[in-house]
Amino acid sequence: FGIYKISSTLFNKQAGKIIFLICFLNPIFFGHMAMNPKDTIIAFANIWSTYILLKYLQNQNSSNKRKHYVLLAGLTIGLGTGVRIPFLMTLMPLLLFAVVDIFFTKKITNSKFSINKFIVDLIFVLVIAYSLTVFAWPHVHGNIFTEPFKLLLIQLKSSFGVPWILFDGIFYETDKLPY
């Protein structure tokens, strides 16, 4: 349903229905269901974060809608980061999309779009998301200001991807691959 809402917002309702059917009937979708229970939550948070960003960009001038979308964005991003912190990296294309639309294309935003409101709202979204993330991680409750950042630094030091790779007929640990 979220894919339909995003497609309908970007294109039209007919395109939204077609894109929803293609995504829903895609056999890869059913093949990967329940592979990792966290991925379902991450996908949910990513889709709804995208939709909420689109609606925020369209309706920033309406005070009630703006507050509503800021709260929802904080909740969905907090849900995603509460499950897995690398979720933040999946939001980078959204941020890039927003910056391009705000400063260059203005296809979704209107002429009255305020960058100052956007920055203030982004701070509120990040505070809400951070609060939910900390709430979901009981091992950081001892010090909610330093422990999450220590864990983030530990995760950044570890290698990403598969632990072993076949290179030139020899198996190597991914982070010790000769170049």
How would you describe each model-predicted region?
Residues 3-12, 50-53, 57, 135:
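Transmembrane-helix signature of membrane-embedded glycosylation machinery that interfaces
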Residues 44, 86-104:
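Transmembrane-embedded, aromatic-rich helix segments that form part
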Residues 34-41:
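Short acidic/glycine- and proline-prone juxtamembrane loop motifs at membrane-interface regions
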Residues 49-69, 104:
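Membrane-interface transmembrane helices that cradle and orient dolichyl/undecaprenyl
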Residues 79, 97-113, 118-179:
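Transmembrane-lumen/periplasm boundary regions of multi-pass, lipid-linked membrane glycan transferases
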Residues 3-25, 44, 67-68:
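Transmembrane-helix signature of polytopic, membrane-embedded enzymes
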Residues 19-24, 31, 51, 77, ...:
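Short helix- or helix-capping micro-motifs
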Residues 42-50, 72:
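Hydrophobic core segments of transmembrane alpha-helices in multi-pass, intramembrane catalytic enzymes
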